[in-house]
Design a protein with these regions (language model features):
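Solvent-exposed, extracytoplasmic
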Residues: 145-156, 242-290, 299
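Conserved beta-strands of PAS-like sensory domains
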Residues: 218-260, 315-317, 327-338
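Alpha-helical coiled-coil
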Residues: 9-39, 71-81
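Amphipathic coiled-coil signal-relay and dimerization helices
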Residues: 124, 133, 171-177, 275-286, ...
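Extracellular/periplasmic juxtamembrane segments that couple receptor/chemosensory ectodomains to their
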Residues: 293-338
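Extracytoplasmic/periplasmic ligand-binding sensor regions of membrane-associated signaling proteins
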Residues: 159, 169, 175-247, 308
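Extracytoplasmic/periplasmic sensory segments of membrane signal-transduction proteins
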Residues: 93-203, 257
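EAAAR-patterned alpha-helical heptad-repeat segments
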Residues: 27-71
C-alpha cells in the first residue's frame, strides 16, 4: 500500500508536469497567433481595427493562461515533491518496521527453543539412571544402563546431537548416540567449558548455556546446555558429575532463519541473521560467514529498531528471553538491499 501511494504521487507529478508544459505551449502559440493577427490588422488599416481589438484580447488571454499555468505549476511542484518524499519515508518506515518485527519473531523462536533446552538438561540430570551411574562405587552396569537411557531420550528428542555424562573428575562414563563420538566414553572433558560451568552451578535449578561453537568431537555446530548431576538427585546435593546436552544448532537455527516469512522477491534481496552479543553471525539465511563474520548493528541502545545504511534497510531485535531463560544477549536481524 505505501509503495502504491508513492507510485501515484510520482505519476501525478509526471502528469501535472506534462500538462503544465502543454498549457504553456498552447499559451505561447496563442500569443504568437495574436501577434501575427495584430500585424495583419495593422496592414489592413482601418478595416482591420476591429480585428486588432480581438487580437489584443486574445493576447491578454494567452498571457493570463501562461501566468496561471506558471502559478499552478509553482504551487503543485513543491507539494507533489513533498508528497513523494513523504511517501518514500513512509515506505522506508513500514519496510523497516516489518523487518524489525520479523527479526523479533525469529529471536523469540530461538528463545523459546533454548528455554526448552535449559529445562531438558536440568530434568534429565535428576533421572534415576543418570544419578545412579555416578553414585560412589556404582558398577559398570549402571553406567551402561545410563547410556541406554540417554539413547532412548536422544531418539525421542531429535534436536540433540548427543548427551554426555561425566563423573566429578571429568571422565565421560556414558553418552546417548550410537552414531556419533563413539570414543566419547572414557575421554577427559575436565578442561572443557561446559563441564566446568556445570560443576559450578549452585543447585539443580541452575544450568549453564554455552556459546555456539564447532564441536570437534561431534563434528557439528552445537549450542551446549549443561548442569551438575547431584548426589541422590537432591536439589542441593553435592555435585557428583555433569550432564551435557549438545543441541543441533546448525540444523535448527537454519530452519528458523530460512523460515522467516518473506515474499519471493524479498527473499532474493534479504539476509536473515542470528547474531551473538558481539555481532558474530550464528546463523545466516545465505549460510555465509557463520561463526566467522561480525555484523555491527547500529542499535543506539534500543532493544529493537530499524535504520538504513549503505543501500540497505536493517531491522533488528534483542532477545527478550522466555520464562526462566533470560537469553544470552543475542539479536535477530534482517538486512534488505534496496
Amino acid at each position: 500500500m505505501p509503495e502504491r501511494v508513492v507510485r501515484l504521487a510520482e505519476e501525478v507529478g509526471q502528469v501535472t508536469g506534462q500538462t503544465m508544459q502543454g498549457i504553456e505551449q498552447v499559451a505561447k502559440s496563442t500569443k504568437m497567433l495574436a501577434l501575427n493577427a495584430l500585424i495583419e490588422s495593422a496592414r489592413a488599416g482601418e478595416r482591420g481595427a476591429g480585428f486588432a481589438v480581438v487580437a489584443r484580447e486574445v493576447s491578454e488571454v494567452a498571457d493570463r493562461a501562461r501566468t496561471l499555468s506558471e502559478d499552478l505549476s509553482g504551487e503543485l511542484r513543491p507539494r507533489i515533491a513533498e508528497l513523494t518524499e513523504l511517501g518514500h519515508q513512509l515506505v522506508a518506515r513500514v519496510r523497516g518496521q516489518r523487518l524489525a518485527d520479523l527479526a523479533l519473531n525469529a529471536i523469540e523462536i530461538v528463545d523459546r527453543n533454548l528455554y526448552e533446552r535449559s529445562c531438558d538438561v536440568r530434568w534429565w540430570a535428576t533421572d534415576a539412571a543418570v544419578v545412579d551411574a555416578l553414585a560412589p562405587g556404582a558398577p559398570a552396569a549402571a553406567a551402561a544402563f545410563a547410556g541406554r537411557r540417554l539413547g532412548v531420550i536422544l531418539r525421542s528428542y531429535t534436536v540433540y546431537l548427543d548427551l554426555w555424562l561425566a563423573d566429578a573428575h571429568g571422565r565421560v562414563v556414558a553418552h546417548g548416540s550410537s552414531t556419533r563420538a563413539r570414543d566419547a566414553v572414557g575421554s577427559d572433558v575436565s578442561g572443557q567449558a561446559w563441564f566446568r560451568a556445570a560443576m559450578a552451578t549452585r543447585d539443580s535449578d541452575d544450568y549453564a548455556a554455552l556459546d555456539v561453537e564447532q564441536h570437534a568431537g561431534l563434528g557439528a555446530t552445537t549450542a551446549t546446555y549443561a548442569t551438575a548431576v547431584r548426589e541422590g538427585g537432591r536439589a542441593d546435593g553435592r555435585p557428583v558429575g555433569a550432564l551435557g546436552a549438545f543441541f543441533d544448532w546448525e540444523h535448527q537455527a537454519q530452519t528458523i532463519v530460512e523460515g522467516v516469512r518473506l515474499t519471493p522477491a524479498e527473499r532474493e534481496s534479504t539476509r536473515v541473521l542470528l547474531l551473538d552479543r558481539d555481532g558474530l553471525v550464528l546463523a545466516a539465511s545465505d549460510r555465509v560467514g557463520v561463526l566467522h563474520e561480525r555484523v555491527a548493528l547500529c542499535t543506539d541502545g534500543q532493544p529493537s529498531g530499524t535504520y538504513t545504511a549503505d543501500g540497505t534497510t536493517v531491522g533488528f531485535a534483542l532477545t527478550p528471553g522466555y520464562e526462566t531463560y533470560p537469553g544470552l544477549g543475542w539479536y535477530g536481524a534482517l538486512v534488505q538491499r534496496h
